[in-house]
């Protein structure tokens, strides 16, 4: 893993960076809760990685009540996501959201390919110590909404939709419940 200071991560203005999202931050409204500078840059594919869900350090997410997304190296697999262009001023809030200080995730550099075939280096996050468990229905829904909103490939959307969630039937945080309700209203 290379150092975050790599030139490829920065846009030409030097004030922003590129972030590859593959979990709940696929959804525009979700990423904007803590990172208002995020602007859609591209749909992209991360080759030789696989999506998984887990409890970081074996602890259930108090926000999502189930496994949360991570990626791990897996030759021949791929993870689709969204590249967001973000102002460097949001880097600390993104790290905080991803639980970097508590050791939930570590920032990594990944090289992704856009649908046009352009390769770009982005910041992303990966859990290093987790127990695989299914996501809550609400978390799965937010990821699927983001995949649909941003036009991830239909086959990948089907794969996301086929993920078996856990049986959590309670509520998640109010701000997330609001996002889910707004998303459901758009599709009806």
Swiss-Prot record:
Binding-site residues for substrate, renumbered to this chain: 19-22
Biological process terms in GO annotation: release of cytochrome c from mitochondria
Listed GO CC annotations: cytosol
Reactions mediated catalytically: an alpha-(gamma-L-glutamyl)-L-amino acid = 5-oxo-L-proline + an L-alpha-amino acid
Active-site residues, Swiss-Prot/TrEMBL: 98
Keyword Lyase: yes
InterPro entries named in the record: G-Glutamylcylcotransferase (IPR017939), GGCT-like (IPR013024), GGCT-like_sf (IPR036568)
Protein name, entry field: Gamma-glutamylcyclotransferase
Lineage, opening ranks: Eukaryota, Metazoa, Chordata, Craniata, Vertebrata
């Amino acid at each position: 893993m290379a150092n975050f200071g790599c030139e490829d991560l920065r846009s030409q203005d030097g004030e922003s960076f590129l972030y590859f999202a593959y979990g709940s931050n696929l959804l525009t409204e979700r990423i904007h809760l803590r990172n208002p500078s995020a602007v859609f840059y591209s749909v992209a594919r991360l080759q030789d990685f696989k999506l998984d869900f887990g409890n970081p350090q074996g602890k259930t997410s108090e926000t999502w009540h189930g496994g949360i997304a991570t990626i791990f190296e897996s030759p021949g697999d791929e993870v689709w996501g969204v590249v967001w262009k973000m102002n460097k001023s949001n880097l600390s809030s993104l790290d905080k959201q991803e639980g970097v200080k508590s050791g939930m995730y570590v920032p990594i550099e990944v090289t992704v390919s856009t649908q046009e075939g352009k390769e770009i280096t982005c910041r992303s996050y990966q859990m290093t110590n987790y127990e695989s468990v299914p996501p809550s229905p609400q978390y799965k829904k937010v990821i699927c909404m983001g995949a649909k909103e941003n036009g991830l490939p239909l086959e990948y959307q089907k794969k996301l939709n086929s993920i078996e969630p856990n049986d959590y039937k309670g509520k998640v945080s109010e701000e997330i419940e609001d996002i889910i309700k707004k998303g459901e209203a758009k599709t009806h």
